[in-house]
Amino acid sequence: MKITVIGAGHVGATAALRIAEKQLAREVVLIDIIEGIPQGKALDMYESGPVALFDTMVKGSNDYADSADSDIVLITAGLARKPGMSREDLLMKNTAIIKDVTTQVMRYSVNPILIMVSNPLDVMTFVAHTVSGLKPERVIGMAGVLDTARFRSFIAEALNVSMQDINAFVLGGHGDSMVPVVKYTNVAGIPLTELLPKETIDAIVERTKNGGIEIVNHLKTGSAFYAPAASAVEMIESIVKDRKRILPCTTCLGGQYGINNVFCGVPVKLGKEGVEQILEINLDDNELKALQASAAIVEKNCKSLASAI
């Protein structure tokens, strides 16, 4: 198993280290355009192997040829958000970056699975799919796992319970229009609505929607990377080990939820072939309308890029 990570920034480097430590691949390649950065970080990771107890070969490069024959490619390249910048502000700039990255990746790997982390996530997943020519089930966006992790962590904090006992789904686009589905949220099987008042739940939902920008506002000069990297690696682990995990991921819908040919976050089964099944769960009218409205925003942004791809 060979996994390439594009982008040696905080998210990419953190993800590469987690992949190595979990020994999900025999070889991890970290690629970045800045000379020396991927090489130095990769060497540092590799040298941690004897004490972190892994044998994964970690290599850094500025040459996409070193990504040849990758089974999975994690794409984290792109500009990060700055304070006051929405994900949509990044649209045109990151489209050009992802178009170039995907073209380079496909030049050297025949049928990889692409995991997208770059923002605006849903639209960049569409761009990568369009440019790569891969089957839609092999181009997957990370957002839902991250948004759900934030939702679960805030619930655990409010209840002072283990995060492992929180089960939840956050659907829709990765942005202000995401849809945390409260009725499917439970704590060790107990519905969340039996444990927290509506006002508290509403506040947690709102905080989840603003989870990324909350971190941006704290950091001033950067954005989240620990949770995004962990979320991406959770997806990769399910694929590598063919675990068939049910995770909320950005995938291309084909009529499910009344949404067609749009990349949107929904529950999927992740296995060795990528998205092996899209689960269409029952939503009430308000939830379904919110999901469709979220998808409509993604679709509008994708259409605006027609001339740029």
Swiss-Prot record:
Active site residues of this protein: H174 (proton acceptor)
Coiled-coil features, chain-numbered ranges: none
Catalyzed reaction equations: (S)-malate + NAD(+) = oxaloacetate + NADH + H(+)
Write out the GO MF terms.
Answer: L-lactate dehydrogenase activity; L-malate dehydrogenase (NAD+) activity
> What are the protein's UniProt keywords?
NAD, Oxidoreductase, Tricarboxylic acid cycle
Q: Tell me which residues bind substrate.
A: R81, R87, N119, R150
Which residues participate in NAD(+) binding? G7, A8, G9, H10, V11, G12, D32, N94, V117, S118, N119
Supply the EC number(s). 1.1.1.37
Q: Cross-referenced CDD domains, in alphabetical order?
A: LDH-like_MDH (cd01339)
Supply the Pfam families for this chain: Ldh_1_C, Ldh_1_N
Which BP terms from GO are recorded?
lactate metabolic process; tricarboxylic acid cycle
Q: What does this protein do?
A: Catalyzes the reversible oxidation of malate to oxaloacetate.
- What name has this protein been given in UniProt? Malate dehydrogenase
The organism is Chlorobium phaeovibrioides (strain DSM 265 / 1930) (Prosthecochloris vibrioformis (strain DSM 265))
Could you read off the lineage of the organism from its UniProt record? Bacteria, Pseudomonadati, Chlorobiota, Chlorobiia, Chlorobiales
